UniProtKB/Swiss-Prot annotation:
GO cellular component annotations of the record: cytosol
Organism of provenance: Enterobacter sp. (strain 638)
Protein name: Glutamine--tRNA ligase
Designated gene of the protein: glnS
EC class: ligase
Catalytic activities: tRNA(Gln) + L-glutamine + ATP = L-glutaminyl-tRNA(Gln) + AMP + diphosphate
Length: 555
């Protein structure tokens, strides 16, 4: 199979293949242009993987360009976060990082060119009046009374805007196109507005800032972008993209292509809604493991490779659709099942005492770090007469489907002995506090000599050697598949999206590394938390369960 045949195909790659075959382009140059006004989420990961992935596959280039045209909402903190997220996902940008603000002088010159051609004018309508004059989908707009100013007057007023001679909101520069256009984006869109705010890159040099639609296409052209890839909501904006480039003196005219954005069940992607979750303290911050942000997914324990695999599986189309959360969870579950070392931790502990085991003694039990990967080695886990097991792994009475410990019956302790429940001790409220058992000393990691069958296996932790751990059971943040469609999306927050448990773990986890994934046997996949874990306190986040419990609940 050739390299081209091995690449995933989609309509964008087909366009690129045709452009290269026809000689329209000899190389491929893409860009990822986020605005540094927030943290990236998994929807951005689709654009990152698409733009950087195409550049990699075609031996081309991909720029990281910050669309930094609104100093009021932007911050250097977001710049650094975005750079980190792109690199964590496994990509590197070509050359130096680009900023739209790098081109402010050229953008101003192109605006002056449009004025000189009679294609832009300074408007003094208020924002509300501009909105009113713009019309609607069913009614044409009407011309501003300032639309027919002379070129000389517009040049003077635009220079006055630049010099700070107008207050914010008192003037703007608009393109002179067609107020009766069926496309509202073409009804004399604003090109420049006034903002007296310090910019994180240019300081106080400017008090006028270009709008996205004016900046985006020119930045693409100046950087030699061959294929400008945007999500579908910018489809109508392509007309303005082309209009600007057609009416200025610039040698390169990139083409814009649109693809569907990523919509994911049980979450929201709107920056406004995500910000509300943070500011109203429904979550602990932008990196809360329940958030769809890349930093949140990373803290929860998602690997970069699992996110890339997810993006690869959903593909690139022009058709808007919503992806099941189970698809994302399946990718990380497959990754960690293959690569995560195993360990034992008891999340809801109850004491179990083996009465015929030598009291005060212990031994080491050898356990594989991965059941199907001997190259991952093994570890020694201490075993003693007193152990912790999970409360759900014992019942005084149970039917035949229950394959765990039952009063008077046997079960195997993982990689250790067969035990039999003999009696229990309860508190005054009837809760079991201790389970008393006997063990078969001849069954260490082997079947009973008399051939009796013991079907159930449960995990355990030696009480004398156990590490106290806080276990944070993260789940889906919302309880409905489409919270964004609800009248009040906050009312659909899942009250059990975070449950905090105090449990015990085997001593090998004492030196767990932040972010490293483990399978807690029979429980799920977990990683050491980067925020709350300390040298003296182990805090583990659940990344994902061993199976999709939501699918079962919905049946």
């Amino acid at each position: 199979m050739s390299e081209a045949e091995a690449r995933p195909s989609n309509f964008i790659r087909q366009i690129i293949d045709e452009d290269l075959a026809s000689g329209k382009h000899t190389t491929v140059h893409t860009r990822f242009p986020p605005e540094p006004n927030g943290y990236l989420h998994i929807g951005h990961a689709k654009s990152i993987c698409l733009n950087f992935g195409i550049a990699q596959d075609y031996q081309g280039q991909c720029n990281l360009r910050f669309d930094d045209t609104n100093p009021v909402k932007e911050d250097i903190e977001y710049v650094e976060s975005i750079k980190n997220d792109v690199q964590w996902l496994g990509f590197n940008w070509s050359g130096d990082i680009c900023y739209s603000s790098d081109y402010f002088d050229q953008l101003f010159a192109y605006a002056v060119e449009l004025i000189n051609k009679g294609l832009a004018y300074v408007d003094e309508l208020s924002a509300d009046e501009i909105r009113e004059y713009r019309g609607s989908l069913t009614a044409p707009g009407k011309n501003s009374p300032y639309r027919d100013r002379s070129v000389e007057e517009n040049l003077a007023l635009f220079e006055k805007m630049r010099a700070g001679g107008f207050e914010e909101g008192k003037a703007c520069l608009r393109a002179k196109i067609d107020m009766a256009s069926p496309f509202i984006v073409m009804r004399d869109p604003v090109l420049y507005r006034i903002k007296f705010a310090e910019h994180h890159q240019t300081g106080n040099k400017w008090c006028i800032y270009p709008m996205y639609d004016f900046t985006h296409c020119i930045s693409d052209a100046l950087e030699g972008i061959t294929h400008s890839l945007c999500t579908l909501e910018f489809q109508d904006n392509r007309r303005l993209y082309d209009w600007v480039l057609d009416n200025i003196t610039i040698p390169v005219h990139p083409r814009q292509y649109e693809f569907s954005r990523l919509n994911l069940e049980y979450t929201v992607m709107s920056k406004r809604k995500l910000n509300l979750l943070v500011t109203d303290k429904h979550v602990e911050g932008w990196d809360d493991p329940r958030m769809p942000t890349i930093s949140g997914l990373r803290r929860r324990g998602y690997s970069a490779s699992s996110i890339r695999e997810f993006i690869k599986r959903i593909g690139v189309t022009k058709q808007d659709n919503t992806i099941e959360m189970a698809s994302l969870e399946s990718c990380i579950r497959e990754d960690l099942n293959e690569n995560a070392p195993r360990a034992m931790a008891v999340i809801d502990p109850v004491k179990l005492v083996i009465e015929n085991y030598p009291q005060g003694e212990s031994e080491l039990v050898t356990m594989p770090n991965h059941p199907s990967k001997p190259e991952m080695g093994s570890r020694e886990v201490p075993f003693s007469a007193e152990i912790w097991i999970d409360r759900a792994d014992f019942r005084e009475e149970a039917n035949k489907q229950y394959k765990r410990l039952v009063m008077g019956k046997e079960v195997r302790l993982r990689n250790a002995y067969v035990i039999k429940a003999e009696r229990v001790e309860k508190d005054t409220e009837g809760n079991i506090t201790t389970i008393f058992c006997s063990y078969d000393a001849e069954t260490l990691s082997k079947d009973p000599a008399d051939g009796r069958k013991v079907k159930g296996v449960i995990h355990w932790v030696s009480a004398a050697h156990a590490l106290p751990v806080e276990i944070r059971l993260y789940d889906r943040l919302f309880s409905v598949p489409n919270p964004g469609a609800a009248e009040d999306f906050l009312a659909t927050i899942n009250p059990e999206s975070l449950l905090i448990k105090q449990g015990y773990a085997e001593p090998s986890l004492k030196n767990a590394e932040t972010g490293k994934a483990y399978q807690f046997e029979r429980e799920g996949y977990f990683c050491l938390d980067s925020r709350y874990a300390t040298a003296t306190k182990l805090v583990f986040n659940r990344t994902v369960g061993l199976r999709d419990t939501w699918a079962k609940a919905g049946e």
